[in-house]
Amino acid sequence: MHTLVFLSTRQVLQCQSAACQALPLLPRELFPLLFKVAFMDKKTVVLRELVHTWPFPLLSFQQLLQECAHCSRALLQERPSTESMQAVILGLTARLHTPETEPGTQPLCRKHTLRVLDMTGLLDDGVEQDPGTMSMWDCTAAVARTCIEQQQGRTAEPGQAPVPVEVRVDLRVNRASYAFLREALRSSVGSPLRLCCRDLRAEDLPMRNTVALLQLLDAGCLRRVDLRFNNLGLRGLSVIIPHVARFQHLASLRLHYVHGDSRQPSVDGEDNFRYFLAQMGRFTCLRELSMGSSLLSGRLDQLLSTLQSPLESLELAFCALLPEDLRFLARSSHAVHLKKLDLSGNDLSGSQLEPFQGLLQAAAATLLHLELTECQLADTQLLATLPVLTRCASLRYLGLYGNPLSVAGLRELLRDSVVQAELRTVVHPFPVDCYEGLPWPPPASVLLEASINEEKFARVEAELHQLLLASGRAHVLWTTDIYGRLAADYFSL
């Protein structure tokens, strides 16, 4: 739905040259809507001039591109267009090249009000690659290039210094882009364009490069550190963690593939693990911890006991958890605060089932997002868990992909989940009834790779849809799509 004000604004921007000439005459209250319309419709000339002459101290994508009273479209939920993003960056560059006081003129108050450009919060699902849109990797490169060019083009003319602007961004870096981003961060020190990273994601980056990058980041800005595919091990982690721990406002820490053999621990390995635990105790604001594919068997109590504050999001996918790990978590202060829990890849079918149910009971009042992909949950285990699962009254998302469930099990889940009024998404497995010649119990690898009888599954989908309609739950999405934009980020919960 669009209001008359929105439609009028869109009409004004049809002729971009005339709109740019009219900007100084328009009330500043119109600028936020002008920005959203120009960004949406790719009116790049106007968009560039809007950034150049922005009349407020803050230009925030999260404020301007969300659903508003004039337009229900939330652009933050879409990957941004390359043209619009480039126009914003060009407008910033033009603004930095404009001195605070131009020779022979009075200061132009409107032109020089902008102090913070907040480009955080853009969608980066990494799924569909539309050539007309900009990924976070491209955005990082574009902002980094602007920093470097700004520093290289600086001139020291008295009285002509541009007003500094703080640019807040989420940065993505890998081996290929590391040197470029490092140069950009160095260039922003003392520059009119100050680069501030909110969320950092580093993929496949050597340990020394990760440390060098962390040392260049502003300790007051960083909210999340996400290290992926780095295979740090305990030794590498013990080198990196003190550099991460200096970010006292860090709310989210995502570490993966931290290996250490708990069955045959070495002296060095134990020393590294103790040092890691000591550093983890320095965080005062941590709310999300992800340790996916890390060997934590029998060690979860040591890890979580060091934290100063309770977690709201905990991801322990493929961590080989033992029953005692789940029992400790259920009794800990973290359980009653959890909004998001990911136990994917941990076998919950045997002796882990009872402590897992206890954990669900403890987290029932707060849990919003539960991920149980590839947990070896068959009908028997699911049915035994349903009474406590349905007590999670606030649950919005349930992920069960890769579990050996039958059509009968899915039917029972659908019927019992009717009491969960907040539930919006269920990612379920292909029922075992739809496979041909499936071994029992089927390994997760077989469920992921074996062929599906498409005709049988189409009938199952139709039946589930009819059951949803009959129960008045047509708004709940039941899907087998694990790659869609369904799993919520902790900060969006």
UniProtKB/Swiss-Prot annotation:
<dbReference type="GO" id="GO:0034122">
    <property type="term" value="P:negative regulation of toll-like receptor signaling pathway"/>
</dbReference>
<feature type="repeat" description="LRR 8">
    <location>
        <begin position="364"/>
        <end position="391"/>
    </location>
</feature>
<feature type="repeat" description="LRR 5">
    <location>
        <begin position="283"/>
        <end position="307"/>
    </location>
</feature>
<dbReference type="InterPro" id="IPR050694">
    <property type="entry name" value="PRAME_domain"/>
</dbReference>
<dbReference type="InterPro" id="IPR032675">
    <property type="entry name" value="LRR_dom_sf"/>
</dbReference>
<feature type="repeat" description="LRR 4; degenerate">
    <location>
        <begin position="247"/>
        <end position="282"/>
    </location>
</feature>
<comment type="similarity">
    <text>Belongs to the PRAME family. LRRC14 subfamily.</text>
</comment>
<dbReference type="InterPro" id="IPR001611">
    <property type="entry name" value="Leu-rich_rpt"/>
</dbReference>
<dbReference type="GO" id="GO:0032088">
    <property type="term" value="P:negative regulation of NF-kappaB transcription factor activity"/>
</dbReference>
<dbReference type="GO" id="GO:0019900">
    <property type="term" value="F:kinase binding"/>
</dbReference>
<dbReference type="Pfam" id="PF13516">
    <property type="entry name" value="LRR_6"/>
</dbReference>
<feature type="repeat" description="LRR 1; degenerate">
    <location>
        <begin position="111"/>
        <end position="146"/>
    </location>
</feature>
<keyword id="KW-0963">Cytoplasm</keyword>
<keyword id="KW-0433">Leucine-rich repeat</keyword>
<keyword id="KW-0677">Repeat</keyword>
<feature type="repeat" description="LRR 2; degenerate">
    <location>
        <begin position="194"/>
        <end position="218"/>
    </location>
</feature>
<protein>
    <recommendedName>
        <fullName>Leucine-rich repeat-containing protein 14</fullName>
    </recommendedName>
</protein>
<feature type="repeat" description="LRR 3; degenerate">
    <location>
        <begin position="219"/>
        <end position="246"/>
    </location>
</feature>
<feature type="repeat" description="LRR 9">
    <location>
        <begin position="392"/>
        <end position="416"/>
    </location>
</feature>
<feature type="repeat" description="LRR 6">
    <location>
        <begin position="308"/>
        <end position="339"/>
    </location>
</feature>
<dbReference type="GO" id="GO:0005737">
    <property type="term" value="C:cytoplasm"/>
</dbReference>
<feature type="repeat" description="LRR 7">
    <location>
        <begin position="340"/>
        <end position="360"/>
    </location>
</feature>
<comment type="subunit">
    <text>Interacts with IKBKB; disrupts IKBKB-IKBKG interaction preventing I-kappa-B-kinase (IKK) core complex formation and leading to a decrease of IKBKB phosphorylation and NF-kappaB activation. Interacts with CHUK.</text>
</comment>
<comment type="function">
    <text>Negatively regulates Toll-like receptor-mediated NF-kappa-B signaling by disrupting IKK core complex formation through interaction with IKBKB.</text>
</comment>
